[in-house]
Amino acid sequence: MTDLEKPNLAGHMFDVGLIGGGISGLAAAKLLSEYKINVLVLEARDRVGGRTYTVRNEHVKWVDVGGAYVGPTQNRILRLSKELGIETYKVNVNERLVQYVKGKTYPFRGAFPPVWNPLAYLDYNNLWRTMDEMGKEIPVDAPWQARHAQEWDKMTMKDLIDKICWTKTAREFAYLFVNINVTSEPHEVSALWFLWYVRQCGGTARIFSVTNGGQERKFVGGSGQVSEQIMGLLGDKVKLSSPVTYIDQTDDNIIVETLNHEHYECKYVISAIPPILTAKIHFKPELPPERNQLIQRLPMGAVIKCMVYYKEAFWKKKDYCGCMIIEDEEAPIAITLDDTKPDGSLPAIMGFILARKADRQAKLHKDIRKRKICELYAKVLGSQEALYPVHYEEKNWCEEQYSGGCYTAYFPPGIMTQYGRVIRQPVGRIYFAGTETATQWSGYMEGAVEAGERAAREVLNALGKVAKKDIWVEEPESKDVPAIEITHTFLERNLPSVPGLLKITGVSTSVALLCFVLYKIKKLPC
């Protein structure tokens, strides 16, 4: 842009421009505003919220078709939502959960389905224990510095699972565990990245659990309120339908241009969008090579979120809570949770279509997807009432051009160790937020808040308002949602793996011994 072409920026000058009006960008803007910093938030969509989105209509009152869940140890989002006057409620797991595998339904209670096969039990136990132990070796703020980083980053999670698991039962559930947690396939993701991801969410039990875990609660009225209320506080500082296309930081201030040719001048910029979406922006000067390479190598996960509404919560007649873990290649849905309103109205089941299945099911008409889901629920829950919904909502995040997918970006093999260290590294006066840059609960709303507030403090430090030592701040535990420590029994800590047991004793002796041990701890029926 020549001097003759420079736009008139009268009334368009700000201290900090924020790209992205999701929770991360708005959390950053809110914190900066509290320091009397003049901010501008540019959001590409016609709404705020990013990967959180609360739909409102007469059929559902409100429903979260994007990010929704919060729980213990997610203290930043709990603090922010409380400050905004948004209450939480517990997701219902009072009744039994069910596992559907090999065409049969098995009710259970707890975080993970029980395992009746002695060797499979040993295999499961070793899987969770090994993943957690490996995760503890990985620094949450610098996973590329882990002692085995190079080795683990060359492996896919499929490679690692196949190496750890001895039984097909444990192996297939482990594949599903990857699908559910990061909406991608085990062969697509780096073992180092996935182990880090689970670790920074508190471990295998915390990330997968409802009670005392990442899915314990939702917001009354929907998670979209977090962004909507911050937008209300910021007023006209939030510009919707303003995709950023150009950033020029060659002069004293940064020039930001949007798709509709609006121009703004800022001292600093915070990018709070998924890394791969910054490839839609033209930068002057060009991004450093490592940053440019990184953003081309972080694809987004794939998910369709589906809510089926019923006249009544018929599943409770069988003492089921609505949570289903479904292991069936032909089934569209992999996992469900009760999505009934906290007052018991509008009974609903939320289900995720994940990874490869999201691509497959997206090719079908919405009505066919709905029918297939209802038929699946009828089969798993053993009730024809599942065939007669009163309403259906869904959101295919793969078709969102300003998200690219959900829940989060993932690291394929080799990328974390080669380029991961630049994910939060500023480029000149451009800083980076977004849940992908977090070190606790990355991929969740909690990670979005952590990243946004950290990036805001980096800018405040550059402005001389915050000391460098105060950029990273520990968050006090929520008094309203305290965490319960996750512990493991002596046997869980010390039982051998299947190969370990077979190495010590003969096969027949091993099976007999294991059956006796499991009988004693009441893992097997009398």
UniProtKB/Swiss-Prot annotation:
Q: Which InterPro entries match?
A: Amino_oxidase, FAD/NAD-bd_sf, Flavin_amine_oxidase, Flavin_MAO
Q: Where is the signal peptide?
A: none
Q: State which Enzyme Commission number(s) the record gives.
A: 1.4.3.21, 1.4.3.4
Which GO terms are recorded in the biological process aspect for this UniProt protein?
catecholamine catabolic process; dopamine catabolic process; phenylethylamine metabolic process; positive regulation of signal transduction; serotonin metabolic process
Q: Which GO terms describe its cellular component?
A: mitochondrial outer membrane; mitochondrion
Sequence intervals crossing the membrane = 498-518
What reaction is this protein's catalytic activity? Answer: a secondary aliphatic amine + O2 + H2O = a primary amine + an aldehyde + H2O2; a primary methyl amine + O2 + H2O = an aldehyde + H2O2 + NH4(+); (R)-adrenaline + O2 + H2O = (R)-3,4-dihydroxymandelaldehyde + methylamine + H2O2; dopamine + O2 + H2O = 3,4-dihydroxyphenylacetaldehyde + H2O2 + NH4(+)
User: Which cofactors does this protein require?
Assistant: FAD
Task: Please list where the region (Interaction with membrane phospholipid headgroups) is annotated.
Answer: 520-522
User: Which residues get modified to N-acetylmethionine?
Assistant: 1
Q: Where is this site: Important for substrate specificity?
A: 335
Q: Which GO terms describe its molecular function?
A: flavin adenine dinucleotide binding; monoamine oxidase activity; primary methylamine oxidase activity; serotonin binding
Q: Which family does it belong to?
A: Belongs to the flavin monoamine oxidase family.
Q: What is this protein called?
A: Amine oxidase [flavin-containing] A
